[in-house]
From Swiss-Prot:
Family affiliation: Belongs to the peptidase M24B family.
The organism of origin for this protein: Paracoccidioides brasiliensis (strain Pb18)
SUPFAM superfamilies in alphabetical order: Creatinase/aminopeptidase, Creatinase/prolidase N-terminal domain
Pfam family, one: Peptidase_M24
Role summary: Catalyzes the removal of a penultimate prolyl residue from the N-termini of peptides.
Name of this chain's protein: Probable Xaa-Pro aminopeptidase PEPP
Binding positions (Mn(2+) 2): 264, 275, 438
Record's cofactor remark: Binds 2 manganese ions per subunit.
Length: 468
């Protein structure tokens, strides 16, 4: 099913702007205003014990400074001269027979936002020339990403530390071109979610709905998924990153159709990712227990979104989401005690064990989040984004409530923590599995811009699921 969406943003991918941004960050970190930035694209790799190539995925840091998706490529950026050069593979007559003519140097210069395009055979000679022109100064590269045949010997100083940090910090704030790519990925992915909603009541297996999603994305220009899609029915939705996607939607033990399908899936458009989660009732209507949990999670997300703007501490937004979850579970009778005591004891982690969200861009879990996985507070241990939100950053907002026995049972059996959970009331909710709602938003100075258009109001999802 083809999906009609807005066209790709006009003009070239702004590689030169990105190179200047990275160079400025290197200078801010105290490394001067001259030198050569050197990066390599991803190499072609073969499948082990086979003559077939592995699926190719360009190195994100290389693409950020080049806009070039070609394998086996290189780049240099002369900071002082403000000259960005990419090096692309030359024509290999033997390969032309199988794969056709590759991009020429002249064509690449027209396509990419660079100052020069050369053959990969000229990388070392160009490095030596730059070094001579600069008086043998500094080259910046990323450790373990320099090919054995590349030589930096003419340079007086080689820095393998600052470049990776400078690129990853620069990638946090997106420019308008990047946001347009992210919006396109979200538009295509959101409409693919709708296609799944419409097929939910007739599908017989998780893989059928995954196939509908992936097919809708591919027919609209997204050949790759941002990550392995999650199509988790029934209690499978209690597993955060469920991978199988192959179980029947009628339970083999009870003979009953499972309640819901959690869909965590997003397409990758020109190296930029969407990361969207929705839940659809497989009968076309949420069960009472499913609807109660869904409403809590939706309120968790709405409360979080209301807080978002540049400078807000992400930990505060995450804490608010936990408090909303606690209040909702108290109202249902699943939890008992006071909101404050439950928050301090971290009881909500039994039902909401992951972080509220993360930066999004060329990687699903994008750079610059500065997580602290050693945090002793379980509420924050898996929070992939820490600190103040950056204007122009793109974040996921993905609260959830899950009924995972592996996680909850230790709380129930704990002499200290078991008293806070009403096991009798909880029994009614195991079959819900899990509910997560995830949108992708651009942080602005005054609020946010939600890129995700997939419906999330329960009434709208039910309408689409039963639409003929």
């Amino acid at each position: 099913m083809a999906i009609s969406v807005d066209q790709t943003p006009a003009g070239k991918y702004p590689a030169k702007v990105h190179a200047k941004r990275v160079a400025a960050r290197i200078q801010e970190l105290g490394h001067g205003d001259s030198g050569i930035i050197y990066l390599e694209g991803q190499k072609t790799h073969m499948i082990e014990d086979s003559d077939g190539e592995m699926p190719f995925r360009q190195r994100r840091n290389f693409f950020y400074l080049s806009g070039c998706p070609l394998p086996d490529s290189y780049l240099t950026y002369d900071i002082k001269a403000d000259k960005l050069t990419i090096f692309i593979p030359p024509i290999d007559p033997a390969s032309v027979i199988w794969s056709g003519l590759p991009l020429s140097v002249e064509e690449a210069l027209e396509i990419y936002d660079v100052d020069a395009v050369l053959s990969t055979a000229e990388v070392n000679a160009s490095l030596a020339h730059y070094c001579s022109a600069q008086g043998g100064k500094k080259v910046f590269a990323i450790a373990d990403q320099v090919s054995p045949h590349i030589t930096f010997l003419p340079f007086q100083e080689i820095d393998f530390d600052v470049l990776k940090r400078a690129v990853e910090e620069s990638r946090v704030v997106k420019d308008s071109y990047e946001i347009a790519l992210l919006r396109r990925a979200n538009e295509i992915s959101s409409k693919a979610h709708v296609a799944v909603f419409k097929a939910a009541t007739s599908a017989r297996n998780e893989r059928e709905l995954e196939a509908i999603f992936v097919g809708a994305c591919m027919s609209s220009g997204c050949r790759e998924q941002s990550y392995h899609p999650i199509f988790a029915s029934g209690t499978n939705a209690a597993t955060l990153h469920y991978q199988k996607n192959d179980e029947d939607l009628v339970d083999s033990v009870t003979g009953q159709r499972r309640l819901n399908m959690l869909i965590d899936a997003g397409a990758e458009y020109r190296n930029y990712c969407a990361d969207i989660t929705r839940v659809v009732p497989l009968s076309g209507k949420f069960s009472p227990e499913s609807r109660e949990i869904y409403d809590i999670v939706l309120e968790m997300q709405n409360s979080s979104l209301a807080m978002i703007k540049a400078g807000v501490m992400w930990e505060d937004v995450h804490s608010t989401s936990h408090r909303v979850a606690i209040r909702g579970l108290l109202k249902l009778g699943i939890l008992r005690s006071t909101e404050e005591e439950l928050f301090e004891k971290g009881i909500s982690v039994a039902f909401f064990p992951h972080g509220l969200g993360h930066y999004l861009g060329m990687d699903t879990h994008d750079t610059g989040g500065n997580p602290n996985y050693a945090d002793k507070d379980p509420k924050f241990k898996y929070l992939r984004l820490r600190g103040p939100l950056a204007s122009g950053g793109v974040v996921t907002v993905e609260p959830g409530i899950y009924f995972c026995r592996f996680i909850i049972d230790p709380y129930l059996s704990s002499p200290d923590l078991g008293k806070y959970i009403n096991a009798d009331v909880l029994e009614r909710y195991w079959s819900v599995g899990g509910v997560r709602i995830e949108d992708n938003v651009v942080v602005t100075d005054s609020g946010y811009d939600n890129l995700t258009t997939a419906p999330k109001l329960p009434e709208e999802i039910e309408r689409l699921a039963t639409e003929k």
